[in-house]
From Swiss-Prot:
Known EC number: 2.7.7.3
Organism from which the protein derives: Helicobacter acinonychis (strain Sheeba)
Role description: Reversibly transfers an adenylyl group from ATP to 4'-phosphopantetheine, yielding dephospho-CoA (dPCoA) and pyrophosphate.
GO annotation terms (biological process): coenzyme A biosynthetic process
Protein name (record): Phosphopantetheine adenylyltransferase
């Protein structure tokens, strides 16, 4: 059976921090699924279609990465793909508190599921999609925070 990991997120937009985690975690799995969440409750800046297209462009050089859109429970998605490991990033203490709760909730729904947490590399530690959206909203230049392939998307906003 293939070793599969799932890296879920809203990716609104995808950042260099996300790509760093995709790069490092893709080396641990035969296949890494990047699952773009619908997340209507978060009121995303970019549509699901745009977010999926951005992440596909940004990961096209990764041979073992597949990008999908999903809605519903992550634990169910993991079962569907026969995945036993979720990949998550942790930047700050508040991320840890939230991610720990989510990890336990997912484990309670799918007992075979484990969560693997990645700390960002130093140069990406401060980057978040929220910061990128704020810079964009104030007409600033966020090109150094996102993959070059997606800059045309965010420069239109």
């Amino acid at each position: 059976m293939q070793k599969i990991g799932i890296y879920p997120g809203t990716f609104d937009p995808v950042t260099n921090g996300h790509i760093d985690i995709i790069h490092r975690s893709s080396e641990l799995f035969e296949k890494l699924i990047v699952a773009v969440a619908h997340s209507s409750a978060k009121n995303p800046m970019f549509s699901l279609k745009e977010r999926l297209e951005m992440i596909q462009l940004a990961t096209k050089s990764f041979k073992n990465v597949e990008c999908i859109a999903f809605e519903g429970l992550l634990a169910n998605l993991a079962k569907e793909y026969h995945c036993r490991v979720l990949v998550r990033g942790l930047r700050v203490v508040s991320d840890f508190e939230y991610e720990l709760q989510m990890g336990y909730a997912n484990k309670s729904l799918n007992h075979e599921l484990e969560t693997l947490y990645f700390m960002p590399t130093l140069q990406n530690a401060f980057i978040s999609s929220s910061i990128v959206r704020s810079i964009i909203a104030h007409k600033g230049d966020a090109s150094h925070l996102v993959p070059k392939e997606i800059y045309p998307f965010i420069s239109k906003v």
